[in-house]
Design a protein with these regions (language model features):
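ER/Golgi luminal nucleotide-sugar-dependent glycosyltransferases, focusing on the catalytic module
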Residues: 1-165
Length: 165
């Protein structure tokens, strides 16, 4: 039986999320037979999910920002080897009471993997997310103009990161 509530709550929900991933890797037949994983964190409906996934061309797909210290993770693609050798070893560093979130730990793992030769790319475009409140179980209001700005920013960011000068 899985007990996902064994840890100090001050560590945060990211700590619990990683514990779920670790448990799945160790106990799930499906996870043990799979080589690539797609994670959608949070209570999200990603409206352009298929478009993002159909345009993944590298081993790792993840957005990273805030001077490469924050791996924004509404939709990520990770190979199992990355999860086992980079992501899970960083897991114990999560402590939201100290400002160390799962996104910070994920960025450390991502940068270590890139330094070791993994290929990485930004998402094809920014995810268009319909978010659901965990407290009220209601959808947050979507702002179409905001989504358009985010989409164009993501295209520019991808161009700058991936252009060969």
């Amino acid at each position: 039986k899985y007990d996902g509530q064994w840890f100090d709550r001050s560590l945060g929900k990211g700590f619990g999320w990683y514990d779920q991933i670790k448990t799945a890797m160790n106990k799930s037949n499906f996870a043990q037979e799979s080589e690539v994983f797609v994670f959608v964190t949070g209570r999200y409906i990603v409206k352009n999910f298929e478009k993002i996934l159909l345009n993944v061309n590298k081993e790792i797909m993840c957005d990273i920002k805030e001077n490469l210290t924050f791996a924004f993770s509404p939709v990520v693609v990770f190979p199992k080897t990355f999860i086992l050798n980079y992501l899970l070893p960083e897991w114990k560093g999560i402590d939201e009471s100290k400002g160390l979130t799962m996104e910070h730990v994920q960025s450390k793992a991502l940068l270590r993997a890139i330094a070791d030769g993994y290929e990485w790319e930004l998402p094809y475009e920014a995810p268009i997310i319909d978010t659901i409140s965990a407290i009220h179980n209601k959808h947050y209001k979507l702002y179409p103009f905001h989504n358009i700005i985010i989409q164009y920013y993501s295209y520019l960011k991808k161009f700058v990161f991936e252009s060969k000068r």
